[in-house]
Amino acid sequence: MNYVQQIRDKAKLILIDVIILSVIPILALLLRFEGVIPAAEFMVFRNSLPWMVMISLAIFYFYGMYHRIWHYARIRDLIAIIGAVTLSQAAIFIVTVMADIPVPKSVTILTWLLSICAIGASRLMFKVNLDMVTESKGNKTNLLIVGAGDAGAMLVRELEQNAAATTNIIGFVDDDEKKRHGRLAGFPIMGNINELPQIVKANKIDEIVIAIPSADGDTIRHIDSQCHQTGAKVRIMPGIYEMVTGEMAMGQMREIRLEDLLRRDPIHLDFAKITNYIAGKTVLITGAGGSIGSEISRQISRVGAKEIILLGRGENSIYEIHQELKRKFPEQTYHTVIANITDKERMARVFRKFQPQVVFHAAAHKHVPLMEIQPDEAIRNNVFGTQNVAELADKNHAEIFVLISTDKAVNPTSVMGATKRTAELVLQEINQHSNTKFVTVRFGNVLGSRGSVVPLFEKQIAAGGPVTVTHKDMTRFFMTIPEAVQLVLQAGSQAEGGEVFLFDMGKPVKIKDMAEDLIRLHGLTPGKDIKIIYTGLRPGEKLYEELLTSEEGTTSTKHKKIFKAHIQPLDEQDLKASLQTLNETTDRQTILKTLKHMIPTYKSKQLENAN
């Protein structure tokens, strides 16, 4: 129902009421005088009828009789009819008394009773007619919108323009009680979110669309849990970030994703500061084909870098991100480089050729169990690869170097975490003798990355289960990829040199709960349709992650979601000696003992078992 249809329906109701209000008084007179109306009485009514009808229509209008949703009429609507008719007849009676117009009281009472019956019957017929029209649209999808705000109104316009032939919009639900029983874009606001199951059942809803782009994860989770009870298909409008970046348009809809359930307040960035250190600069991104590296390249492209060098050793991933960026940002200059960060000569040629002013170092090995098996490769890539790129940045006078680290570097129990902590120490040492500002950013898991648990869970659910979780109490910090990269860029703008920045990761999330959420998002029931089994912790895995060691403290920064850790660098000579040992050996026990020497909080099961 659109605005034109709404006006038509109001006009129909007013016309019906005019006919009823004109006929009922004559019928009351016929009953009063047993079928023969005296000429004098008839003349009085004929002259009075126009203003009586006008008074009744005015009272009906202000009483809301033409704003009600008769398609969903209930007992309270019948009470409203009684109230409106009673008020109008009382007003007419007062006028006739004051104007000394002779109207028998019995006629007034009969008119009151007959008007209630006739107007009530007209509304019932109106409801039946609308129900028949709705049923005739059986090939259409009955759609309910959650969120009676600007986004909901925009969605209605989009659907009426592009999906009118297949979609029958029924109305809205919204938790704002002030909106209850009102209308938006011509459609009724039918109740609140907790009433979703009843509303869906009563109105045969096929699909529910969540139209609250600013809603946080807890709100989305609550709405989804209510929707899950209905059996209706559920979709969602994009979040604020997706619309701002152009990833999705306002009127588009998609399935609910896990990241929707983890939404936090939008991050407010100081774009002026980010622009100051990136705009017009040559930027090198290592690991540019990975989850974090590719998102850094997207966001930097919006800032307006002079040139962006996309470096990685996997040709397919570099090719894919390059094609995407060229399509989205045709004015931006890109260079693709296939190289291994541990290849000193190759990387030196890259730095000499492009002379990058800003470096984002996202290249790393990150799979914990794999690095437990081959610690020498983790050392070569995560430690010496980082050292190689950092020293070249210093030698070629880069302005800022940002290392992407991990919460697994804190009190590490894995080789991967220990090598990332070592890379942080290497960066701090280089920073002490360089004009380049070297900083580290530490954060937890990112949703949607190729190494996260989510893709694994998705495959297991698609295969019919079971979903494998290592431990029922395992928790992790999670951020979305765009959220993490926004904070990486902001942290870079605050760099003075030597800092380790931490992000506000929100509350840790139980992996078990995440698995259950994903199962429900597929319309299935955890434990019934898809089993969850617990496999035990893998080598190097923690039950929970930390962002700080017990010795470290933090201070706030100018951004409320970014903190600076107080970390003491390792003795320079000790660091160099340890790095030399790591560089000269491939022996597993020597590597683990050296890492333990450099990082006293490192706890290695392999070392403990060897002892």
Task: Locate each region found by the language model.
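Strand-loop microenvironment adjacent to phosphate/nucleotide-handling motifs in alpha/beta enzyme folds
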Residues: H268, K273-Y277, E429-N445, R450-N611
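A solvent-exposed beta-alpha-beta segment
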Residues: F33-I37, F126-T245, Y319-E320, R327, ...
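Signature of alpha-helical transmembrane segments in polytopic membrane proteins
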Residues: M1-G138, L143, T167, Q229, ...
